[in-house]
Amino acid sequence: MSDELLTSVLTPNMLKGLTYRETALRVFSVLLSDFTKTELAEGIERAYADNFASVAVTPVTRVGDEFLLELHHGPTSAFKDVALCMLPQLMSAALKDTGRRVMIATATSGDTGKAALSGFMNVPGIGITVFYPHGKVSDIQYLQMATQEGRNVAVAAVEGNFDDVQSTVKKIFASDLRQELADEGVQLSSANSINIGRLVPQVVYYFDAYRQLVEANEVEQGAKVDFCVPTGNFGDVLAGYYAYRMGLPVRHFIVASNANNVLTDFLTTGVYDRNRPFVKTITPSMDILISSNLERMLYYASEGDTALIARLMENLRNEGVFRVEGEMLERIRSLFKCGWADDAETSAMIREAWRKDGRLVDPHTAVALKVARERADRSVPCVVLSTASPFKFCRDVYIALTGRPLEGDPDGFAYMDALSGLTGENAPAPLAGLRSMPVLHKDVVRPEGMADFIRAAAARAF
């Protein structure tokens, strides 16, 4: 992304009175200048007109002293929908009349996979393969992917954790398979945040959240706010950082982590060290030790010192650790704050949000809410990103509220029904409907078998 595009080119005042879709058009017109305004407007209409349960797309609501930016009203009930309803529109526009085809290879820790499968299902000229860590996503997340229909989709579980899956996908992009597919007229691409087209749509909801706060008289135009973001891969908070560089008034981005708190340690000490035990938590989408998007922020924090960033990333690959010091670290720490929560603290916040505030939140949102409420300086409003429906993680939310599992610890649908009965809230229709859908994808592969799986998927798709 061009440095020049990220220098105070948008101000909140320019977005006053706009709808979400109008705000998206303003942001995309700046960041995606290779597309015509008509292409962007038509893509935005297809992405956001009917796919979201809320007219606001990403509404902001109050929970206690904080605000929730609700990002889970899309077709798969996760924040990835905001980007992955738009990315297929962008890729289709780019491919139009070219005769080119694209094979997407995507790693997921839970939410990206289903959102990408849903967004790209049966899109002409595009095939998609999704890999997730075997046994390390929730029951509902698994079923969302395993039941996915579409003539151009393929799904496989991978033995290992998300870091194993993600690092292998990255290696595949630098492997002979990329050229092999290119020789057949197929471009290898990604729906992960390594694809900048995945991040750009997420910039929009930061600007739109601020607009909503101003219009609700919760913040004065131009006044700074905090955003607290639950993240493992640093992608969602990076989108906010892009918005900040474009002109959004932000005091701090608060990076909220689970027990895999490598980002907390880095922002506290300047040392990024992935040489630690991998912890399986009730926030599986954050069970990550290699935050692939951190590199992009470091580039700006180093004032574009590409040689330094290359050395840091080489150290991470070879030794599993790198260190940032001096003025660069101070620049980072002046904007990015941090905190983390273990599973017990996460469950406690789920209970607190329900009993005290009457809000049912998923575990990832609970991590961020807990960290936000521990801010040392609460003098400015704080927007907490609510990244998924609690019904995607109904077992863990139910146990957090009741203190015990159901008798026999049954499948996710029993917990979905029990959570609905306990709280009086209904699961989103796409999640509730999973129980009647057949499992279509049962493949389990080792990391070294992922390239062959993509090769076979491309042969079927095209």
Briefly describe each language-model feature range:
Residues 2-462:
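PLP-dependent amino-acid enzyme catalytic core
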